[in-house]
């Protein structure tokens, strides 16, 4: 027997819940308006995508003030005793001018250091003058966005009752992946440390064609060499990560730097041997503490925590042409070797530039209009089509490029 619902006319003095399923009482709907709870869908989607954020968990957000343009600038002061501190202010202990004005700079040579100590005589004088250098770093924000459309009949007759929630979820996942890809791309392009495996000196010379031991394959020795370079660059060994569904909590991972790799390199890391031919890889279950794990973390090697990113980018067909290695290593167009990065990002090496953000999270602005009077106009006089759009601002400021490193390797099939 068909259900019978009361007429709205019988409740004209009350606010009526306009249940969309009660089609026979919609002829005289309450002024309270249509029922739609997109905020529930959006909240659930936000909770879901936190699990898919890899690079965002390392960055805080620098908020762009309103009415101040789209570019943010910061001063980066270089240390006094640093080869990058080049100026014309230098006077030595004898009062003579010398180049660079940074005493002995970054030198570790005992002879050079002992000869440039800023000693003073009894009368002092104009001696031991030094200078300082600062650099201006800057980043800009850009507005991003996309939209999708749907018809009233799609919502009413589609097999999936949760059609709208699925579209909201997938659009927010898409926006999150776009943001992650933007961050990853800028980190790969902005890295200040480049390391090439084997005998290669750049991506174009990456090869597996040489004698055994010269192939451009990542080894434990490469990882040790990279660790020393980052130590010399004063890259922090502790890493701050942003956690929680609201992305406002922070935790610190002590004595570890984060290395991001693609799934193509995972087996090479798991099978890696150290200098004593012992397994170098420590799987995550050996040390796991649920409060300090990163999204995608699989284990550790030396001083690095290894995170596998399923959407990790690579350089297609960037190496030499494969002959001996064809069918053994991954290749692209023209049978040239693909080159895969292992990306290391030091803590606070970069910051996201946001506009009207919340905490350290991107603030996505979603606009949804359901089919009906809200969307009806001369191009759609019957209001049959609705739409939803999502937009956000993205920008990134690389603060310490010398704390970002890319280790290049071929990948075994």
Predicted regions and their residues:
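Short acidic, glycine/tyrosine-flanked loop/strand segments centered on an H-E-D-like triad
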Residues: 129-158, 353-365, 370
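Exposed beta-sheet edge/beta-hairpin loop segments within beta-rich domains
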Residues: 63-66, 156-166, 250-253, 373-385, ...
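Assembly/oligomerization interface modules of large self-assembling protein complexes
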Residues: 57-144
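Amphipathic alpha-helical scaffolding segments
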Residues: 91-95, 164-173, 276-280
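Structured, hydrophobic secondary-structure cores that serve as assembly/anchoring elements
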Residues: 142, 148-152, 156-158, 162, ...
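Sequence/fold signature of self-assembling virion shell proteins
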Residues: 2-58, 203-244, 254-413
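Hydrophobic alpha-helical segments involved in membrane association or supramolecular assembly
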Residues: 74, 169, 173, 181, ...
């Amino acid at each position: 027997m068909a259900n019978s619902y009361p007429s709205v006319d019988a409740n004209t003095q009350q606010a009526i819940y306009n249940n969309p399923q009660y089609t026979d009482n919609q002829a005289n709907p309450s002024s309270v308006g249509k029922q739609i709870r997109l905020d529930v869908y959006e909240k659930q989607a936000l909770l879901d995508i936190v699990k898919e954020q890899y690079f965002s968990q390392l960055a805080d957000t620098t908020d762009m003030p309103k009415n101040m343009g789209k570019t943010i600038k910061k001063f980066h002061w270089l240390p006094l005793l640093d080869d990058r501190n080049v100026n014309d202010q230098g006077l030595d202990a004898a009062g003579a001018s010398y180049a660079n004005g940074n005493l002995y700079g970054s030198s570790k040579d005992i002879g050079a250091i002992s000869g440039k100590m800023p000693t003073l005589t009894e009368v002092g004088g104009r001696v031991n003058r030094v200078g300082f250098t600062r650099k201006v770093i800057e980043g800009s924000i850009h507005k991003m966005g996309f939209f999708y459309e749907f018809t009233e009949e799609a919502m009413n007759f589609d097999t999936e009752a949760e059609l709208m929630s699925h579209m909201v979820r997938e659009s927010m996942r898409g926006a999150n992946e776009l943001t992650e890809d933007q961050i990853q791309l800028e980190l790969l392009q902005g890295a200040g440390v480049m390391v090439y495996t084997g005998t290669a000196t750049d991506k174009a010379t990456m090869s597996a064609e040489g004698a055994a031991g010269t192939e451009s394959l990542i080894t434990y020795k490469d990882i040790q060499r990279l660790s020393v370079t980052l130590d010399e660059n004063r890259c922090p060994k502790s890493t701050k990560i942003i956690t929680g569904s609201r992305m406002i909590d922070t935790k610190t991972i002590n004595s570890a730097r984060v290395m991001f790799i693609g799934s193509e390199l995972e087996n090479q890391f798991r099978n890696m041997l150290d200098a004593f031919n012992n397994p170098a890889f420590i799987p995550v279950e050996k040390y796991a503490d649920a409060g300090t794990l990163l999204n995608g973390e699989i284990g550790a090697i030396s001083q690095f925590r290894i995170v596998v990113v399923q959407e990790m980018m690579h350089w297609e067909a960037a190496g030499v042409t494969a002959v001996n290695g064809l069918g053994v290593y991954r290749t692209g167009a023209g049978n040239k070797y693909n080159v895969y990065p292992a990306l290391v990002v030091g803590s606070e090496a970069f910051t996201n530039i946001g506009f009207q953000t919340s905490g350290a999270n991107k603030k996505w602005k979603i606009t949804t209009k359901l089919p009906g009077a809200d969307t009806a106009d001369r191009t759609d006089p019957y209001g049959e089509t609705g739409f939803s759009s999502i937009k956000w601002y993205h920008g990134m400021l690389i603060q310490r490029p010398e704390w970002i490193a890319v280790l290049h390797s071929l990948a075994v099939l």
